[in-house]
Every structure is written in C-alpha cells, then in structure tokens.
C-alpha cells in the first residue's frame, strides 16, 4: 500500500517517530525561503542521536559544488537515522503556447517569467528512500502541494517511478508545516 496520508508530515511521520518534527522544520524552512527570496535554497536536514531535527545549509548546486554536497549528504546518511535534502530542480514545463506546430520550443522555459518549476525533497531512513516534488511558480509566487515521486518500498505503484525515469503524476499532499 502506498503512503497515501492526509499530509506530507503524516507520511514522513510513519517513517520515524521524530520525522513529524523534522517534516515541520523542512516545510517551514522551504516555505520561508520561497516567500522571502522567491527560491528554495538547497538544505540538508537530519535527526540527531537525541531525536532533534537539525539543518545544514549547502552552497547552490553547480558542477563545482555537487561532489562536496553529495559527499556531505552521504556522510549524514551514514551517521544519522534519517536524512533529507531539499533543492529546486532544474526542470521547467513547456506550456502548449510555448511550442511551435512542429514541436520545437518557441519560448525556452528559462526565458518565461511565468514558468512552472519543481522543488524536490528526498528523504532517507536506512535503505528506504522517499522523494517528493512540489510545483512552484514565480509570477505569481506560489509553492504547490507535495506529490510522491518515488518510494523505494513501493517502486511499482502508479504515481511513483525511479529517479532515473520520467516523473509521473503522484499523490498530492496539502502544503502544511505543523
């Protein structure tokens, strides 16, 4: 059975008792960054040995910083029972109006101020991985509901796919942080 719950915090809470608290920190931080700066800055989150949620800011992801960021996340995964990583992902949807009749793009998504993009949250507990995405728009500024993209415990279910595959429509979670 898939992790269909009333909220993303309930889903995260089923993975580890302290995950509800961590989920609140993650969602509040993501919402605060987006409302303040118009973007979601990359961050790593983890639960300490005494069960407290903690946050680590990471540099903006680039070809130069990715190896050190992933090394840090890998270290957190080895040393903490639950780890999460949040970042905007470089993916934008092309609307039908942005396409030429031959299928080529007449307006590149990066040049469209009204483009729709994605924020991704990846959560690990031991060998289990659950990934969520939320759609964002910048004009007007809006951070949408979270959807399950992948759950390693349920790899074959509708709405979930491997990280290497195309994203499929997932289950929706109202944006909340309590």
Q: Each predicted region: which residue ranges?
A:
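N-terminal domain-onset segments
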Residues: 1-74
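Low-complexity intrinsically disordered segments
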Residues: 78-178
């Amino acid at each position: 059975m898939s992790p269909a719950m009333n909220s993303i915090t309930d889903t995260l809470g089923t993975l580890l008792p302290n995950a509800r608290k961590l989920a609140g920190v993650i969602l509040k931080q993501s919402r605060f960054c987006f409302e303040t700066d118009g973007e979601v800055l990359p961050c790593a989150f983890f639960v300490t040995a005494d069960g407290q949620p903690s946050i680590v800011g990471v540099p903006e992801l680039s070809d130069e910083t990715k190896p050190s960021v992933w090394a840090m996340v890998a270290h957190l995964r080895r040393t903490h029972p639950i780890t999460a990583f949040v970042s905007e992902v470089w993916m934008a949807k092309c609307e039908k109006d942005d396409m030429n009749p031959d299928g080529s793009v007449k307006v590149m998504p990066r040049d469209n101020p009204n483009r729709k993009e994605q924020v991704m949250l990846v959560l690990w507990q031991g060998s289990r991985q659950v990934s969520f995405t939320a759609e964002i728009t910048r004009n007007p500024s809006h951070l949408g509901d979270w959807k399950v993209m992948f759950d390693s415990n349920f790899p074959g279910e509708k709405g979930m796919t491997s990280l290497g595959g195309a994203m499929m429509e997932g289950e929706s979670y109202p944006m909340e942080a309590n």
